[in-house]
Amino acid sequence: QEPIPDEQKQVAQLERTEIVDGAHFYAHVANDTSVAALQEQIGASCKRPLADSTYEPKAGHTCCARFTVDNEWYRAKVVSRAATEFTVFFLDYGNTDVVTRDRLRPLDPSLGPQALSPQAVECRLAYLVAQPANDRAEGEEAAHALSDAAWGEPMLARVEDRDAGVLLVTLIDEAKANINEELVTQGLLRVAKSFQKRAAPLV
């Protein structure tokens, strides 16, 4: 079977929230008011004083975590612990932080990921690979290039495929330029050695 035509593929306007590397990022669906509404609920719930002074979440547990940059509370998952510090992953934005125990709170089950799905959409540039952002100059340059491509502005994403919940996308800017192709042309990304394009519409 031939791959389906581009015009039949799902498209969405995305606003990026976190760049992992030059081909991997997290985003929100543009103009989705549910993120702000959820954040209000989380802020109100997590600001309450900690009733149990011995609270100490384990790796893999979800919780409230107070982000170092803006001191606001967000839903998070504990990734790891080293001595008195916890590395957390923010479920609704895709970024990470290292915080101390006093910046963690239990998460109300009604706000947990089982009740309300994480709002950060994990995406990869379809069929492309990059050096890790912290691995040599090429990886850092690729991450900066993806970040500079209309950061903070909605960008059209054409969904080429899905892989274990991750969207494989082609990004198109306002000038209808193909960001994926531009990053490859600049030598910042390379095409994966092997991949199989979907030959049926995404459901």
Task: Give the residues covered by each predicted segment.
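Intrinsically disordered, low-complexity segments and flexible domain linkers enriched for serine/proline
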Residues: 1-203
